[in-house]
């Protein structure tokens, strides 16, 4: 129902703007996300929206729908709703930004909103346990080093991008070994193991 409302109003060319949202489209987006989170569904919303848009385009050719623009606009609305809803639930804005900043592709964000929620829950738990500052220091150092290189930022395969023979200290070797152990957990989205 919520998806149908979003599709139909967006297909008409109407969008929420500023404080104006006469069809409660933002609320429909929030409801859609809340259902996904409450049920724990692993749903690629971007792909799902893409299929729905293509179906609507085929069903209603008289509307002359620009399916690419419609898909992009719907994804952007849901991206904004993810950020807004997580902040409204009381998560710290810096943690919400850590999992959903503009540097995170919308496609990645919507490919599994449940994953976004789980990563945010993990960061929140790390902050509460006082372990987050130490982890942030390591991640920031690694990010600064990666910026100096030519790595693709989405490549998380440690053994493919790191040359242990170039290490100069035991701490580098220890860090590498930890990352190799964590890699299958991260790729399997098992953040708490």
Identify the meaning behind each predicted range:
Residues 2-193:
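Amphipathic alpha-helical "coupling" segments that flank catalytic cores
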């Amino acid at each position: 129902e919520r998806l149908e409302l979003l599709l139909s109003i967006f297909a008409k060319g109407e969008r929420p703007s500023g404080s104006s949202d006469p069809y409660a489209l933002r609320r429909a987006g929030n409801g859609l996300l809340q259902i996904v989170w409450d049920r724990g569904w692993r749903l690629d919303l971007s792909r799902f929206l893409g299929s729905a848009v293509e179906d609507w385009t085929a069903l209603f050719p008289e509307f002359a729908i620009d399916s690419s623009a419609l898909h992009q606009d719907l994804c952007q609305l849901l991206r904004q709703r993810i950020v807004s809803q997580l902040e409204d639930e009381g998560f710290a804005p810096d943690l919400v930004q850590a999992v959903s900043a503009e540097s995170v592709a919308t496609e990645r964000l919507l490919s599994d909103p449940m994953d976004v929620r789980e990563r945010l829950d993990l960061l929140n738990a790390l902050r509460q346990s006082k372990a987050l500052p130490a982890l942030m220091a390591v991640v920031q150092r690694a990010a600064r080093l990666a910026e100096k290189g030519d790595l693709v930022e989405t490549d998380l395969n440690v053994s493919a991008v790191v040359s242990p023979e170039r290490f100069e200290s035991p701490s580098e070797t220890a860090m590498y070994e930890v990352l190799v152990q964590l890699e299958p957990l991260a790729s399997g989205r098992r953040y708490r193991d």
